């Protein structure tokens, strides 16, 4: 079925080069969009300059092109949207939905990652403070297309969460919700490491009156040492001369398969065939997938 209203996206962070785990997520989002004639947008989530690796942005773009993952429209960089984030932050602050927090990491030790609310009613000034969003004592539920039903009690399991850091950098949760709405994203396909973030995003979308996308979280690729493939663990970058072979391997990770005769095809030919055959129902219904299973 063709659905020209489908708008998906891939949103890498330039803290390092793309690796095989990145490819699995990018491929899933690309094929899910292309299989129904939808649009696939690219957004660079460059919110944290101190963590950005030199040359990573250009390397990411080159890798996507070499692997045939051509996006629609212009690249969006979050670093160009600070004015929009600040306007939203001020709106939430003015409505009493956000507040300044001066808690140090030491003060929050022992809280298990759940903010205990020390500054909730303190009335601190915004200067030299993080900004937190008040959360309700409610359970947020959603149905993920692969992971199934998921629920989270925001008050008990998360607590009031940061939407701008103390150093002035905007937090992922704020930026991703605003940018998805601004770009008209109605289908989010990404790694299962972000499953736990989704209820926070649903709550913020609800507060702001934004439409809520459909979500699909694909399994993370786990290395033999138990760590996920990721930039934090120095996973090897995708080589430029093995696009077709690694795309076929990524298809296997997503429960899809390609005939042997496509082993010598170009990346574009393989992707065109894969988009016609794409079936999201075949994606393994697990959060983690051992890399050793894909060899």
Residue locations for each model-derived region?
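N-terminal Rossmann-like or analogous alpha/beta NTP/dinucleotide-binding catalytic cores
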Residues: 1-113, 193-210, 262-265, 269
């Amino acid at each position: 079925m063709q659905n020209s209203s489908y708008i998906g996206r891939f949103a890498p962070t330039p803290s390092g080069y793309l690796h095989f785990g990145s490819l699995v997520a990018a491929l899933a989002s690309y094929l899910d969009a292309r299989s129904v004639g939808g649009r696939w947008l690219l957004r660079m989530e460059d919110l944290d300059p101190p963590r950005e690796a030199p040359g990573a942005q250009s390397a990411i773009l080159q890798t996507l092109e070499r692997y045939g993952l051509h996006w629609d429209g212009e690249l969006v960089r979050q670093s160009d949207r600070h004015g929009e984030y600040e306007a939203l932050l001020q709106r939430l602050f003015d409505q009493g939905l956000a507040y300044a927090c001066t808690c140090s990491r030491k003060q929050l030790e022992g809280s298990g990652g759940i903010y205990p609310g020390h500054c909730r009613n303190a009335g601190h000034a915004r200067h030299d403070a993080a900004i937190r969003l008040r959360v309700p004592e409610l359970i947020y539920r959603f149905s993920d297309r692969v992971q199934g039903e998921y629920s989270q009690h925001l008050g008990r399991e998360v607590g009031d969460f940061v939407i701008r850091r103390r150093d002035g950098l905007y937090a992922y949760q704020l930026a991703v919700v605003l940018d998805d709405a601004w770009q008209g994203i109605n289908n989010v396909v990404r790694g299962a490491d972000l499953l736990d973030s989704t209820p926070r995003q649903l709550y913020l979308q609800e507060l702001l009156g934004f439409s809520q996308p459909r979500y699909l979280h694909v399994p993370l690729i786990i290395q033999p040492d138990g760590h996920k493939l990721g930039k934090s663990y120095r996973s090897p970058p995708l080589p430029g001369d093995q696009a077709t072979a690694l795309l076929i391997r990524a298809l296997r990770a997503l429960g899809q398969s390609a005939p042997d005769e496509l082993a010598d095809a170009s990346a574009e030919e393989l992707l065109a065939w894969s988009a016609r055959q794409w079936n999201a129902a075949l994606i393994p219904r697990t959060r983690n997938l051992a890399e050793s299973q894909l060899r």
